[in-house]
């Protein structure tokens, strides 16, 4: 059933059916599919059949949602695997997840089987013909980041995302990503051990995300993911205790979308001149949301929390983006990236006209 609410301006669905043909479940993935649709793009040299990226922690290691009828990994341009550390981790004590108004708090604690198991057991089970798979690297020390990155570099994974929001145990537990110097050190160290596309996931929990982006670019990142979750908490007033076992958790979902959108715009001001692509993420649930992020400067858009209540949301977002492109006479989605018109842009147009 076509959801016209997801199509900006009530666009006629029939206008985009040819454009969506290659996104059907049985269509070929990879470069062939990418060449056939206006949703296709190139991201760090990789062919994406869609601008949608499924975010780390929301689809396990890329196979969980394939058990749902109607779901297909082909609806996403790429899938980011669950955060992986050097050794296996059990994660945080319960409760780990809590629903909030227009969002969700989570504090999973990087539960994962460790990089050796992921590389030897999980990666061989993935169908790399369906979509691109991106590893998510986490660590408590720079040395751990480097070792996990090195292991993924020798694997069939398509790209590597660095989660720099992890606490640095050598510096009292402060998050690497909250400080430009620490962020740059992690990126530079990982850059030295891989030739695969390197994506740095920026934290919003910092003073100046633009400076952090600039330092990560100088350190060698190929792309930026903006933003990670925003730290928050919830309290059980009867027990007078935190609801989340870890006290605090990461807030995601529609509640953070305006913040994420601003951060993407700010990072694009730094990354755009260097042609560093951005994965914009934070509260995307509809095609209109995705379009806002693309206009703000994102080349690709991340979908995460929305998958928990609508596993088929990616297909609907793809349909809505394609409809918008058709209605506005745009040949492909890349023509829309960074086309935000600010008051300054309008003033410049008036002066030059």
Task: List the model feature ranges, each with a label.
Residues 2-4, 10, 17-36, 251-276, ...:
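Alpha/beta catalytic cores of nucleotide-metabolism and tRNA/nucleoside-modifying enzymes
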Residues 16-133, 139-140:
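N-terminal capping/small domains of soluble enzymes
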Residues 48-51, 127-133, 192-198, 270-275, ...:
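Short, surface-exposed connector motifs at secondary-structure boundaries
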Residues 65-66, 145-146, 210, 311-315:
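Conserved strand-to-helix beginnings and helix N-cap segments that scaffold or border functional pockets
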Residues 52-55, 77-81, 133-137, 160-162, ...:
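Hydrophobic faces of well-ordered beta-strands that scaffold small-molecule active sites
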Residues 57, 84, 165-167, 229, ...:
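Flexible loop residues that form catalytic
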Residues 140-279, 288-292, 296:
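Alpha/beta enzyme core
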Residues 88-92, 234-236, 311-314:
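Short, charged, surface-exposed secondary-structure boundary motifs
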